[in-house]
Amino acid sequence: MEEITINIDKIKINDDWKEFLRDEFQKKYFLEIKKQYLNAINQNIIIYPPANLIFNAFNLCPLKEIKIIILGQDPYHQPNQAMGLSFSVPKNVKIPPSLNNIFKELQNDLNITPAKSGDLSSWAKQGVLLLNSILSVEANKAASHSSWGWQEFSDAIIHKLSNEKSGLVFMLWGNYAKSKEILIDNTKHLILKAAHPSPLARTGFLGCKHFSKANEFLKKVGKIPIDWKIV
């Protein structure tokens, strides 16, 4: 059997992020992720998001422009939902319950009318990294790739962004996301914590005012605030 290796040049991620994450791509755990991925594909297992969208969060959010990180857990596992951006779904796909609550909070906080589309690409293009901790999932099986090693990759990204950038906003929603707080230097960055926006979570997300708080912080550190309206 042919030995599996990592050819960094072939990873579908833009050049700035590729350089930023080069060391991670060369680590043993990333090779293990690739092995598991190829093994699943060889068994004709359906994986979301599609291969060309796995690194979509990075390809839409320029590294030089990054301002905010919104951390999700793993991709949606139903057909046509996952697009490589945490909480986001493509245009013309029914808006999931968690995203509905995010839109409700935007209305409460900034008087933004809830969008008809759940595609958050316009946020990403302004510098919002919509990062899932786990970057892939088997169809119809939530958290099915949680043992693959993706968390090591996303943890390294959070830690590296914290160390090498300043004046970022990290939005941590729910206990899983809040557990990543230890990776972030709170003397350089703003950490905003709330309950998960899922309707299954106990109260604590609605009323958090994270979107206005983030923009106030960005202005304070001399950055252009985010236009949270969905385009």
From Swiss-Prot:
Family matches, as SUPFAM superfamilies: Uracil-DNA glycosylase-like
Top-level enzyme category: hydrolase
Transmembrane spans: none
Alphabetical list of SMART domains matching this protein: UDG (SM00986), UreE_C (SM00987)
Residue positions of the active site: D74
Keyword Cell inner membrane: no
Compartmental location: Cytoplasm
Keyword terms: Cytoplasm, DNA damage, DNA repair, Hydrolase
UniProt key word Cytoplasm: yes
EC number: 3.2.2.27
Gene Ontology molecular function: uracil DNA N-glycosylase activity
GO biological process: base-excision repair, AP site formation via deaminated base removal
Principal location: cytoplasm
One Pfam short name: UDG
Any one of the GO CC terms: cytoplasm
Swiss-Prot/TrEMBL catalytic activity: Hydrolyzes single-stranded DNA or mismatched double-stranded DNA and polynucleotides, releasing free uracil
Family in the record: Belongs to the uracil-DNA glycosylase (UDG) superfamily. UNG family.
Biological role stated in the UniProt entry: Excises uracil residues from the DNA which can arise as a result of misincorporation of dUMP residues by DNA polymerase or due to deamination of cytosine.
Protein name: Uracil-DNA glycosylase
Record organism: Campylobacter jejuni subsp. jejuni serotype O:23/36 (strain 81-176)
